[in-house]
């Protein structure tokens, strides 16, 4: 079942206007939660993983931006942003190319650009007795006794004690915020 809620949109002066039915709440499948095959009987049991999604879409110029806050069954929160819409183009002489974009059709250049998003999360849901952790995976040096194959790593936790920025860029491999 999908449920829609009103949202408040602010203008450049900070005045709020209620917009009806602009926030969507729904549950969706998130792959396999767990699976096990009994090797004696050959029978398999599979349980699906579900996630609760709060989503809204905004239109800015020629793009629609989709923001989805996904709450999974293990207590994790994933913030997903997606862009859709129509690429803005400028004229380019036929047969020419540019370092500043890609020719997408004869005479049409889509300029190079990027989309940058910032997310603010208030972890004080249901009170202030919560803890936000940053977890980082660190490889453990090879050791003949404790790590002979070099595949051992450890998780180091850093408690976030005050408001600050955190780098959640995808290239930060091995980092999670929980």
Regions found by a protein language model. Give the residues of each.
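Beta-strand/loop-rich accessory regions of lumenal/periplasmic or secreted enzymes
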Residues: 1-177
